């Protein structure tokens, strides 16, 4: 039967527990720092590692706009207006006046985009129009009114 003392027990009373000089087995200082320490701009002690494995570690990238400045532009396409015209008439968003159908998009959108076609001459009221949308509305015999 083999009887072997544990290393910890053997080294009781030893200053360094087998690590040589006292300062050799201290904290992060003997290991080049902890984690990403030393990867910064100053002494570049881990510069080659930074360049190879973390090239984006330094430097600024973009910015985030403050929430009070951000504003989502709600859009609607000509295609969706044309397809849902009956529904818009029922809800009262669109109405007929002097033989023309007037669609007031300000209730549900900020800008009208020119995707799709218009089959009827419509008068569309909106806060903004894309250039293509204006062209298509006029080509169909309608009118684009800025509110």
UniProtKB/Swiss-Prot annotation:
Name the residue ranges with Basic residues bias: 1-28
Q: Does the keyword Transport apply?
A: no
Gene Ontology, cellular component aspect: cytosolic large ribosomal subunit
GO molecular function term, any single one: rRNA binding
Looking up InterPro entries in the UniProt record yields: Rbsml_uL15_N, Ribosomal_uL15, Ribosomal_uL15/eL18, Ribosomal_uL15/eL18_sf, Ribosomal_uL15_CS
Q: Which GO terms describe its biological process?
A: translation
Region: Disordered; residue ranges are: 1-43
Report the domain of life of the source organism. Archaea
Task: List all Gly residues biased stretches.
Answer: 29-38
- Pfam families in the record: Ribosomal_L27A
Q: Does the keyword Phosphoprotein apply?
A: no
For this UniProt record, the keywords arranged alphabetically read as follows: Ribonucleoprotein, Ribosomal protein, RNA-binding, rRNA-binding
Physiological role: Binds to the 23S rRNA.
- Describe the protein's quaternary organization and the partners it interacts with: Part of the 50S ribosomal subunit.
The entry assigns this protein to a family as follows: Belongs to the universal ribosomal protein uL15 family.
Q: What is this protein called?
A: Large ribosomal subunit protein uL15
């Amino acid at each position: 039967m083999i009887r072997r003392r544990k290393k910890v027990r053997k080294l009781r009373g030893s200053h360094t527990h087998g690590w040589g000089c006292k300062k050799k087995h201290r904290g992060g200082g003997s290991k080049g720092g902890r984690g990403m320490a030393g990867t910064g701009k100053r002494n570049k002690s881990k510069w080659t590692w930074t360049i190879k494995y973390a090239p984006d570690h330094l430097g600024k990238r973009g910015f985030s706009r403050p929430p009070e400045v951000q504003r989502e532009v709600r859009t609607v396409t000509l295609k969706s207006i044309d397809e849902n015209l009956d529904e818009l008439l029922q809800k009262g968003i669109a109405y007929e006046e002097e033989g023309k159908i007037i669609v007031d998009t300000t209730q549900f959108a900020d800008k009208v985009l020119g995707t799709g076609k218009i089959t009827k001459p419509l008068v569309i009221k909106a806060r903004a129009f894309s250039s293509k949308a204006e062209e298509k509305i006029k080509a169909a015999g309608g009118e684009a009114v800025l509110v």
